[in-house]
Amino acid sequence: MTQSIQRAVWSFWSKPFQVDRKSFWFSEKHHLLSWVLSFERARQHYPETVLITDDDGVRMLVDGLGLEFETVSTELNALQSHDPEWWVSGKLYAYREQNKPFVHLDSDVFLWKMLPERVISAPVFAQNPEYFTFGDENAWYRPEIFRETIESRQGWLPEELSWYISENRNQAMCCGIFGGNNLEFIHHYADTAIQIIEHPKNKTSFAFLTCKSVDSFLVEQYFLAACIFYHQAQAISVYSNVNIECLFSTFEDAFTQAKQVGFTHLLGGAKQNPQLADKLERRVAKDYPDRYQRCLNYLDQVARAA
């Protein structure tokens, strides 16, 4: 029997952000304001709030912004020496650490309403399915290249991923939100995804991947679909009855139905849109004036220390 989810989880591995990913935002101020809005909106619906981060993340989000997470873990200190191009490691470690049903939110996701019961009661859930074309060099997902790069150098891939690619499956799952009630399956998925990144046999192969930061989406989102559909196809698998529910049925619905559902995700270029940045700033200044001022004070403090 499933439980009603009370736990909202965020993760922040500071190393990839410091190296590259901060450039994804209109400004550092708007990145921080997004954290404020994501946290404050979600905790109205999911009161047990958890942050999985490292020491630098604590200094920024807890000491700096004053976000009042119920639980803070510095589990991601374990990634200090890891390759920051595999930015998704922070999320995968956070998924693996959970010991009760949860929803993990990216910090650019804002929940204006509770997630529907059909979603939060599911064994596993994600934001929406994504599809791509095999052989498209501009696609976010290039599983045939990923497999060839690893297998040609005697690397290691889990059975789920090898099978899914061999079947030419072209479905992934967007993980702007991710979570569920079947923790055994989620732990298996997250731990196996981490093994793909950390397996000693893959170290040589990864030197030949041209964009590991993009392949991170494959390891998280394509492999999630691979895990679901592989085990559904194996009658003897303990996970054969695990299904996944998506908040939106299609990528397009995530835009056209977002207001109705009460969900905002600042995907991709939206983070650098000046009009959206202005709306974000005005919303936080209006709804959370103390947090807004705390953000400005923190930015001043960082600037003075530079």
Regions found by a protein language model. Give the residues of each.
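Active-site regions of enzymes building and remodeling cell-envelope glycoconjugates
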Residues: G64-A78, P101-F102, R118-Q127, V261-T264
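Short, polar loop motifs at secondary-structure junctions
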Residues: T53-R59, S107-K113, V242-I244
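Glycogenin-like
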Residues: L111-Q232
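Short, hydrophobic beta-strand segments that form beta-sheet elements in well-ordered domains
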Residues: E48-D55, P101-D106, A126
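A conserved donor-nucleotide-binding helix/loop in the catalytic core
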Residues: H30-L32, L37-S38, L76-L105, V109-W112
